[in-house]
A protein has these predicted regions:
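Beta-strand-enriched cores of mature, soluble protein domains
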Residues: 18-142
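Sec-dependent signal peptide recognition
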Residues: 1-8
Length: 142
């Protein structure tokens, strides 16, 4: 059910960009962050990717992506959990869901994230498993 809700949400956001011929303008919350993949666990039904980064606005963040496959195995849906530590007294958590696809060895992911406190982000993530790197862009939805 969560996956279906995430997929519908992403599709709705993309359809808003074409409503009345107006483009959807999203504001970046920060510059692009570089990801470091810390582990990948591959299974028959899903793959789990763990990564970390240093965000300008959230501080040190640890993320887990659980990817389910489509019939072709080159995309699907996923869920996300993240924890961030801005300083010794400030922590935040977020959860979300999205869609992913693979082009060659690169994985492209689009997710909606509900951050503790009511903030909603659209994240666009590109992962390069071969080099254990990636990029993470964060856009303000709410």
């Amino acid at each position: 059910m969560t996956r279906l809700l995430a997929l519908v949400s992403v599709l709705m956001l993309s359809s808003f960009s074409y409503a009345d011929h107006h483009a959807l303008a999203l504001e970046a919350r920060q510059s692009t962050s570089e990801l470091e993949m810390t582990s990948i666990t591959v299974g028959d039904d899903f793959t789990v990717i763990n990564a970390e980064t240093l965000f300008e606005i959230y501080g040190r963040a640890y993320m887990t992506f659980t990817l389910s496959y489509n019939a072709e195995g080159n995309g699907g849906t996923y869920t996300f959990e993240g924890r961030a530590y801005l300083d010794e007294e400030t922590a935040a958590s977020g959860s979300g869901a999205g869609v992913w696809n693979r082009d060659g060895t690169k994985i492209s992911m689009h997710q909606l994230v509900n951050v503790l406190g009511g903030t909603i982000n659209l994240d666009i993530i590109t992962i390069d498993p071969l080099n254990r790197t990636g990029t993470h862009d964060v856009y303000a939805v709410k």
